[in-house]
Every structure is written in structure tokens, then in C-alpha cells.
């Protein structure tokens, strides 16, 4: 596995593979890798000839009161997992490499971001599409791999790829979970022992919501209340940041219960904010 830190070396390495007619699979990450990331790598390994992973904690998607400096980083751990997983190139740029000068232009997301994380984190998704535009141009992948856990991000990135004609096939992979149902996340390390024991209730609540919808329930307030009551059975969380239903991928109010629906949750614990979701009537790509 090659570890590359600058744009020019990456471009040259990618061009060499393109000249050999190799297909490129790309897994963008912010590091502190876990099994969820490696599942994306596994899919890329099976479906493409050459796998590139980036590890870059992107400052432009963090708000002024968010945890950019505290975000967990462990390059040695990431490199070990990436190599064991079959990554061919690990791209680990500095902030200066990706943002060498102040931006002269700005990408602004106007749809799919007025609710959930988009509402709570102003400018977050602008930062996401900005860095992915840069990285997509550098890696020039055939396939790019994302996890369903970040479903709103997936919807936003799908819009980016469609709007700007990126010749990239987005592959959306099911959320990887612990044995007790908790979605794998780099932020799980911040949970106390009691919080970690109780956090799987988020997934349990979402499953309840799914069951209600699939049984024909269309009273949104009732569905949300049942899920809220379930989460509140385990009192270690500080608050429920959101628990809501929307059409997917539009993130507008549900008007047709036979089409794509997302049930999404964000729950705040003492040092971690965990997100999870269930997609209904949605085929993964």
C-alpha cells in the first residue's frame, strides 16, 4: 500500500492505473477507521481493480462550536487497517494541501438540507460538497462508496454528482452495526459505559417506527411518539436532537407512504451525538 500526502503524486499514481485500464474504487473518510469503513473497502475491493482511501478531517464541515480539534485521529491505526483491508493508496493530505489558498468560489447546497443535520449544522453540507468536489477531481474514481448511516449526506452527495455530471457511480452500503444493533461510529468511543449499554435503544426505536409504517400506520405524530417513548426508556442520554420522518431522498414531508421514506434520529449523550436511520421503500445503489 502506498501512503501519499500530496496532490501531484496522487494524480500520477491514478493516471498510471487509468492507462492500464484499471477501474478505481474510492472510499472517502475522516479517519479513525472502524469496521464500517472497512466494509466499504471490502465492497470496493470486490467491485473495482484499484482502491483509494482518503483520510482527511475536513475543517470546512465543522461549525464554530463543533469538535474539529477534538475529532479522533490515529494515522498509524488507520494505515494498518487500510493495508490489511486491501487499500492500494491511502491519501493523507494536510489541510494546506486541500485548501492551499482562500476559496475564490463557494458551493452552496440548496435542497435536502433544511432539516435534521442540515438545520442543526449551518454550512456543514456546503463543506462536505466542497471537499468532495476537490477529492473527486483528484481521485477520478469509477465508484465511490458511502455508508447508509450518513443518509442525509448520501442524498446531498447524490445531488452533487447528478447536478455537476460527475462520471461516478455512487455505491451506498448498509450501515454496519455492533452485535447489539448500535451503528458503528468513530464517536462511539466517547460514550461512558452506561451510555454504551443503553445506546442500542436508538436502533430499537427506529425499528419500531419501521414496523409501524410497514403495518400501515400513517399518523406521523403517533409514530414519532412511540419511538420517543422507546428511547426515553433508557435515560442516560441528555436529549433527543431530532426524531423525524421525511421523504427520501428529498427530505420533504411525507405525502406518499408507498415511496421512499427515511426515519432519522440524533441522540445527544454527554460527549457524543449519535445518528442513525432506517430507509423504507428505498433501493440501495
From Swiss-Prot:
Chemical reaction(s) catalysed: (R)-pantoate + beta-alanine + ATP = (R)-pantothenate + AMP + diphosphate + H(+)
Molecular-function annotations in GO: ATP binding; pantoate-beta-alanine ligase activity
Pathway assigned to this chain's UniProt record: Cofactor biosynthesis; (R)-pantothenate biosynthesis; (R)-pantothenate from (R)-pantoate and beta-alanine: step 1/1
Keywords from the UniProt entry: ATP-binding, Cytoplasm, Ligase, Nucleotide-binding, Pantothenate biosynthesis
Binding of beta-alanine, residues: 61
Binding site for ATP: 30-37, 147-150, 176, 184-187
Enzyme class of the recorded protein, top EC level: ligase
UniProt subunit comment: Homodimer.
Note in the entry: The reaction proceeds by a bi uni uni bi ping pong mechanism.
Name of the protein described by the UniProt record: Pantothenate synthetase
Gene giving rise to this polypeptide: panC
